[in-house]
Regions:
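Short edge-strand/loop segments of extracellular domains
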Residues: 257-263
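Short, solvent-exposed loop/turn segments enriched in Ser/Thr/Gly
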Residues: 234-236
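A short beta-turn/strand-edge loop motif at beta-sheet boundaries
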Residues: 247-249
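Interface amphipathic segments
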Residues: 1-100, 108-109, 119-228, 263-332
């Protein structure tokens, strides 16, 4: 003997989970069953369950064995994960998901496992301009009752970003280790590349070398607080960074213009060059001449060196230019 059943809406903790339908067939000492669930929380997800319930002679508690499989194809539109958990509101996700496992319940014990795979995954937080794209991998839970995954598992991703900072080709390793094969972000209308980096929980000391490619000189000088600047020209080079307990230090970085590529730079707000120096002195006159020259200067090449003074917690900048003032200088 057998029969069918269906539930239009299945609820749990005031959440409408979706519809359930299935069939039951009685056996000599139990019953076989099969059911499907169309998720309302995760649109497009379908869960199929097949199982058997048996009651042994002299026992009052049945034994249950079942196999389950979940499938969801990537959808055209991302979904708001706030439907799954209120704290996730504003996080949007997508991707193809498959999961399968088996479970056995016997009097006094419960065993269940799960293997879940995802491909083409994406999670974005539009309000914060952050996301992780193209992630894929498999996670195995040998024992679902403890929700602990098996060791040595990895999830790879194509790209992750926060604002203008982006990294590509990375993976999440066991123990919460975050590995980036390549990182990059746009700065001063150029590109800064980060080396392969492994970020580990509890570690607060890192040494990185940033490779800078064609940063615009004028906005660069402004952003590091050297002076207000206008004009063309780019610089490239390397900037070693030391991170110690959340503090950043620059260790002898240098940036230089490409050979044969000069430009014109106009600096404003250079009064600091002569600040505190008595007017009329030779030192004042030399610096005032340089200040006037930098108001508009045609350079053949430019070089910047940067270094942090640990004791003073200051970034020291040295600017070297080879060229000539665009206009004749006043007599000083």
């Amino acid at each position: 003997a057998g029969g069918r059943f269906s539930l239009t809406t299945l609820k749990w903790n005031d959440l409408s989970l979706g519809a359930v339908s299935g069939r039951v067939r009685q056996q000599a000492r139990g019953a076989d069953f099969a059911a499907t669930h169309q998720s309302a929380l995760l649109p497009g997800a379908r869960l199929a369950v097949d199982g058997h319930v048996a009651l042994a002679t002299g026992e009052t508690i049945p034994r249950v064995s079942l196999a389950y499989r979940l499938e969801r194809a990537a959808s055209r539109e991302d979904i708001d994960l706030g439907a799954l958990k209120a704290d996730w509101a504003g996080i949007r996700g997508n991707g193809r998901i498959t999961a399968a496992g088996r479970g056995v319940y016997e009097p006094g014990s419960l065993q269940a496992d799960l293997r879940m795979e995802i491909s083409g995954g994406r999670l974005t937080i539009p309000q914060k301009k952050a996301g992780i794209l193209g992630f894929e991998g498999a996670v195995v839970f040998p024992d679902l009752t403890t929700l602990r995954s098996a060791p040595r598992q990895q999830i790879a991703f194509e790209r992750t970003y926060v604002g203008d900072l982006a990294a590509s080709d990375g993976r999440i390793e066991p123990g919460g280790v975050f590995f980036l094969e390549q990182g990059r972000f746009q700065w001063c209308q150029g590109t800064v590349y980060l080396p392969a980096t492994r970020v580990m929980p509890g570690k607060d000391e890192y040494d990185l070398t940033l490779s800078c490619d064609r940063l615009k000189l004028a906005p660069l000088l402004e952003q590091i607080g050297a002076a207000r600047a206008e004009g063309g020209g780019t610089v490239s080079g390397r900037v070693p960074i030391r991170i110690r307990k959340g503090q950043f230090q620059v260790d002898s970085g240098f940036l230089y213009s490409s050979p044969g590529e000069g430009g014109t730079i106009r600096l404003r707000g250079t009064d600091m060059l002569t600040a505190g120096i008595p007017p009329g002195t030779p030192q004042f006159n030399q610096l005032e001449l340089a200040r006037q020259a930098l108001k508009e200067y045609d350079y053949d090449w430019v070089k910047l060196t940067l270094a942090t003074e640990p004791r003073e917690d200051l970034l020291r900048l040295k600017l070297q230019l080879s060229g000539r003032p665009t206009h004749p200088l006043p007599f000083i």
